[in-house]
Amino acid sequence: MALLRSKLHLSRTLSFISPLLPKTFSTSATSLLSDHENDESAATITAAVSVPISPLLTPEDTQTVEKFHSIIKDHYRKNPTSPNDAILNPSLTLHALSLDFSQIETSQVSPSVVRCVIEKCGSVRHGIPLHQSLAFFNWATSRDDYDHKSPHPYNEMIDLSGKVRQFDLAWHLIDLMKSRNVEISIETFTILIRRYVRAGLASEAVHCFNRMEDYGCVPDKIAFSIVISNLSRKRRASEAQSFFDSLKDRFEPDVIVYTNLVRGWCRAGEISEAEKVFKEMKLAGIEPNVYTYSIVIDALCRCGQISRAHDVFADMLDSGCAPNAITFNNLMRVHVKAGRTEKVLQVYNQMKKLGCEPDTITYNFLIEAHCRDENLENAVKVLNTMIKKKCEVNASTFNTIFRYIEKKRDVNGAHRMYSKMMEAKCEPNTVTYNILMRMFVGSKSTDMVLKMKKEMDDKEVEPNVNTYRLLVTMFCGMGHWNNAYKLFKEMVEEKCLTPSLSLYEMVLAQLRRAGQLKKHEELVEKMIQKGLVARPL
């Protein structure tokens, strides 16, 4: 959320025709930076700047943030609750927590400290300590010496509430801002709009926009663009189009708005509708930019219309619009996925001829193409080129190679590549650790599996369902019911992850064999309480 705030602030200070603004769409290849887990076209007005501006914290404040966060985490570990267990009391206080907070020696709890603590609480994917975060927020903002001028802690808490779909709580916080005369800005509503859209509540997002003036916040062109951007990103193209049509006379559309509409229709798979907007854009005298063309090319490639994509690419060149790395990556992807390495290299060579510098995603595609061809030597050559050119390497760069090494069951090769990853100062992600642990489980290297899990914990890399399935299955296979049970409970209670039925039954079987009938009953009851299994008849 801090990133969103810095982006929005800078969006306001930049002209809509600034040459810097096309960076708005620079995240269009996000998926390839995260193991293809997300859709690639993530271009939005809110992505104007890619580097967050961190609050200015003193070393003392940073330590204070860590202390508060540690107390919250410890309390959550002992009292795990799902954010959706019940409707929260907005005035929630937790007496034991308040006492612990009060023990921390600090002259004043600043808004920056409060904001950072809440941001850290909400930064995890699973096991968000919402109750504890709200209790901390209420404790901090009720202190006599608290400075209520800053809206940022409120905005952060609104973002966290929206993330776990506690929208009534989010509106309560906005009302609280109003009653305390805290500034309510477009940023506040942008946060809530984004969360509504992510929750699939498009009409509520539009309603949120319409309520801005009730709180003394006048909607402007940026807010208009942000709504369209968020709806488009989540494939709510028809809602984005309706919203656009209803307000385009009030807020003059620009290349960013039209490009987001084009993207929305493309993501929804409605290429003909995207083409209509594309033509309307030109008729309105607004020239498509490199991101507009790249989005259309991407959509055509994804639906198999590769020749049409190349036609659009030719039109792009004829219009004098220079392609960038995103354009070529979009042309390259379809060939990578189809295993057409020769075509991938043709696109890459064309890219070099036109003087377009490859980026991380380009090189990641080349590595993937070579690994699909089982040509590890060429894949490593590309990796070495990246390092030599100081092109950023990321976890996905190495994960593709690790997958190939796993396929070949080359444990020594995995060790060598991991050392290379550390030398490149590239941080492993959850996928990296899962691949390596799976390989070490296969080679019966239990010590290495445990070493990887400890490293994950030390580096605060979040485990996912696959991580726990791998570890629990390993311990069950070894007959270590206690470790399997402990990890399964951690998965369900602390991380709020949903295990497969087969994994659940595997742990129950271990408990029965070990004669741990009480733990067996407790686990069954916990799973029933969480609605993960039905109560036996």
Swiss-Prot record:
The protein's matches in SUPFAM superfamilies, at most eight in alphabetical order, are given as:
TPR-like
Localization recorded for this chain is: Mitochondrion
Q: Where are the PPR repeats?
A: 150-184, 185-219, 220-250, 254-288, 289-323, 324-358, 359-393, 394-428, 429-463, 464-498, 500-534
- Reply yes or no: does the keyword Mitochondrion apply: yes
Name the NCBIfam families for this protein: PPR
Q: Taxonomically, what lineage is the organism?
A: Eukaryota, Viridiplantae, Streptophyta, Embryophyta, Tracheophyta
Give the protein family. Answer: Belongs to the PPR family. P subfamily.
Give the range of the organelle targeting sequence: 1-32
Would you tell me the protein name for this molecule?
Pentatricopeptide repeat-containing protein At1g20300, mitochondrial
Name any one Pfam family assigned in the record. PPR_2
Q: Name one GO cellular component term.
A: mitochondrion
Record keywords, A-Z: Mitochondrion, Repeat, Transit peptide
